Structure formats: C-alpha cells, structure tokens
C-alpha cells in the first residue's frame, strides 16, 4: 500500500472565512500555526474549508470500506466492474482482500473525526496502519493538523470502548 496526500485548499481560506464571521476583511494569507491549532481544537466550521485528497495505491478493498463509511468523506474508488477493467476472475469471485486504488477527498474536520475511530486500538490493525500512513503524510505538510489527528481516548480523555 502506498499513500500520498495533497492539500487541495490553503489555510488562508479558513482564516478569511473566520474573519468574515466577525466582520473583518479577508487577509488572503496563511495563518499562524498557533491560530490553526486553536481553530482545530475548537472545531470551528472554517476548518471544513481546508481540504485534502488522499490517494491510496493498492489498498485492500475491505480497509477502504472501513474508511468510506465516515460521513463527509468523498470516495473515488477504482471500479471492479468487468466492463471497466481487466480482471483475472469474475467480480463475484474477487476476495475482500483484493487490492485497489482509492482516493478520498476530506476536510480538516473529517480528518479529526476519522482519526478518533481509525487510530483507536479497537480498529482493525490494517485500518489503523492505513490511517497512520495518512497521518504521517499529513505531518510532512502540516504538523499542526497531524497533531490533532488522535484516537478517541486521547480526544476525550478516556476510552469510550472501555478497552484501553
């Protein structure tokens, strides 16, 4: 499995939207890391304007299903239709573990929400590994965003699964 992440929209978009809500003019500039951290922790709506595209190459089909179940994630999954690609067997015979290329468009709020569930020790090991790879790619671009991608026990201060 390979993962790449591209930040599609800049943080300046969120800053300008937040300024608009308090009657200030847009600045059209990148906000400070301190501002990003505060707005992410507060989970204010402008963070939904910061969008990322996650590209998975050779992701197990069933791991992708775990990820696409989250609301506000927009999936683009390589079709398994026999009229769209050459398969070695019929579509009905493909195992759940078959690998597939999958892209997901998400925003900063969605990254926080998915991390709460998919970084949890109760998530499947394979799904945790896939999401940790996403977090690692995010960290290369935006350590502030990556720092807010935590499991539910860290987010809430206790294990909601009563399992930690």
Residue ranges: model-predicted function:
Residues 1-164:
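Family-specific signature for flavin-dependent thymidylate synthase
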């Amino acid at each position: 499995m390979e993962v790449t992440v591209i930040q599609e929209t800049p943080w300046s978009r969120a800053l300008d939207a937040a300024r608009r809500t308090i009657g200030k003019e847009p600045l059209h500039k990148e906000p400070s890391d301190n501002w990003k951290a505060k707005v992410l922790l507060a989970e204010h709506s402008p963070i939904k304007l910061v969008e990322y595209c996650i590209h998975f190459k050779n992701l197990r089909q069933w791991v992708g299903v775990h990820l696409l179940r989250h609301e506000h994630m927009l999936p683009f999954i390589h079709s398994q239709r026999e009229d769209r690609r050459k398969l070695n067997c019929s579509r009905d015979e493909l195992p759940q573990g078959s690998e597939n290329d999958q892209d997901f468009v998400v925003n900063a709020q969605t990254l926080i929400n998915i991390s709460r569930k998919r970084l949890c020790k109760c998530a499947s090991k394979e799904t945790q590994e896939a999401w940790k790879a996403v977090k690692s790619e995010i960290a290369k671009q935006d350590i502030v965003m990556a720092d807010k991608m935590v499991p539910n026990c860290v987010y809430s201060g206790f294990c909601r699964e009563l399992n930690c």
